[in-house]
Amino acid sequence: MTSTEVRVTQVKTQRQLRQFVTFPWRIYRGDRNWVPPLISRRLAFFDRSQSPFFQEGNAAPFLALRDDELVGTIAPAINFRDNEQLGRKLGVFGFFECVEDYGVACALFDAACGWLRERGMTLIRGPYNFGNSDDPGFLIGGEDCPPVMLEAHTKPYYAAFAERYGMCKFVEDYAYRIDRRPVANDAELIPERVVRVAEYAQKRAGVTVRQAHLDHWDDEIPIARRLFNTALTHLTDFIPLSEEQFRHMALEMKPLLDPELVYFAEVNGEPVAFSLALPDLNRVLIHGNGGRYPWDWMRMWWASRHIDVISFKIMVMLPEYHGRGLDAILYVNTAKAALRRGYRWMDMSLVAEENTQVRLLVEKMGGRIFKRYRVYEMAV
């Protein structure tokens, strides 16, 4: 099939948007490793009156049709705030799904590139569901198990289609898994050398570690935001999160938080590092069928009582404390809490391929790569 036999149209109506949002059910039918997103949340994501993204950007969901049959979706997007701050003309694409037909993929990529080009963009990058932490990358390894939260499960041919279209690798990220092995004493599960590093660092630097106060989460949010933004300023494409952005993210996350999995490290009473791990919501969503029917919510409620996986998502520290072992301190505290809480295994992701320091520590903790994701880019 050639791309000329495929008609691509921009979503204009609520009916079309619902078709866009529910199309993945066709692509992943029978795939036990796919985690259906909540339909209500996906619809709200594209609601310009609700979604925070549209306060600083624009996006256009597209449908690919062949003989009036829906065969693919894509959504190019532009974050004007980020582009202005970084002096770039970058667009992203996300929500890419298609049948196993390169002609369909080509038509979708053509539509996304064309939409971005018309708006003055010179580069396309993705897949991202608009944000760098929203299902980034095509899965290129690890299709044999479900993803953890904020990560994607995609068809193996997607990456091949992107490369055939002319896209090149921009970055590769790894998801690590640390399993709880059967041992006589749980303390044996945390490598002794990592514990020694953490204990020595804690004494030498005078570090105290405290759990986050979830009863006063509103007071913790600005502290976490300051640490997050300051710690990541060295990254080339990093844009500090505004107070509104970070607050929205933190409040949305609050119902999922376990106080024993959120830590601040302090020196002389001043916060210098922050870490956060979450019970993996995907262990719930995988049973929910997108929340289409009342019984889907009952199944999710039941599954929520038996989450046995945590996902370590954030570990940041002030630049002047790099190399002092604070990462080991926070990792060890989280691992001990996970063991106390009875979690079966811990995900640590995503870790960039070039982030050798974090990868080394995770591997010392017993982590092994169980998923690989690749983000692509090309000139438009």
Which positions does each model-derived feature cover?
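TRNA-binding/sensing appendages of the translation machinery
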Residues: 2-44, 113
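Acyltransferase donor/substrate-recognition loop-hinge adjacent to the catalytic core
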Residues: 3-6, 152-237
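Flexible loop/turn segments at secondary-structure boundaries
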Residues: 17, 80-83, 132-134, 183-185, ...
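A conserved beta-strand-loop-helix scaffold within acyl/acetyltransferase catalytic domains
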Residues: 24-66, 74-84, 211-316
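Acyl-donor binding region in acyl/amide transferases
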Residues: 83-167, 288-364
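Short beta-strand segments
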Residues: 125, 177, 264-266, 276, ...
